[in-house]
Amino acid sequence: VKKASPSLGDINLDVDIVQQAQTYEANGAVMISVLTDEVFFKGHLDYLREISSQVEIPTLNKDFIIDEKQIIRARNAGATVILLIVAALSEERLKELYDYATELGLEVLVETHNLAELEVAHRLGAEIIGVNNRNLTTFEVDLQTSVDLAQHFKKGHYYISESAIFTEQDAEGLASSFNGILVGTALMQAEDVAQRIKAVSY
């Protein structure tokens, strides 16, 4: 659930966030990602709180988390999963925040974009590893990022492909290597959200 992004600007400012989340849940989503960054994504922690209280499935606090206070706020707002971005943290700091979150009973999605970052996630022992198809420096997207990194996956991890997934063909191309996909913009822009969810589900 995101109203805007740095690369696209405003996406869907008038969306009823709770209704949107409930539509996701009703059509087979297993987790709902909620953007809470106010500056770049026009999100808010209250959105996470509202959605978490109105759905049964887990919610992910998708934000640029760099300290323990943010993790506490995420948990208090109802998140069961948080995002930690390898590119934004030293390996030592990543481990500190990962351990802190798991000690609080939270799951952690550890986001990577290249092989070096994937290796960091593996060394960390992250259970859930995301591959972001968007370069956070240039904002360019390429599904080949997921295809390439999938060659280096290891057993014992749950892999999620993130960003730039719009069509049934996009999803099908990832199904053999990834346990799940994170779809944001495509659903926020869709006229028929339920139909779009079914199109990208596998």
Residue ranges of model-derived segments:
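Glycine/Thr-rich beta-alpha phosphate-binding loop at enzyme active sites
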Residues: 3-14, 20-40, 122-150
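C-terminal helical cap(s) of enzyme catalytic domains, especially alpha/beta-barrels
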Residues: 143-153, 189-202
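Hydrophobic faces of well-ordered beta-strands that scaffold small-molecule active sites
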Residues: 1, 32-34, 51, 59-62, ...
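Glycine-enriched alpha-helix->loop->beta-strand junction motifs that scaffold or abut catalytic
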Residues: 28-29, 54-57, 76-82, 102-106, ...
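Catalytic cores of alpha/beta
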Residues: 66-78, 114-125, 161-183, 195-200
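Short loop-to-alpha-helix "cap/lid" segments that border enzyme active sites
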Residues: 45-56, 68, 89-96, 113-115, ...
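Glycine-rich phosphate-binding active-site loops on the catalytic face of alpha/beta enzymes
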Residues: 30, 73-93, 130-139, 177-197
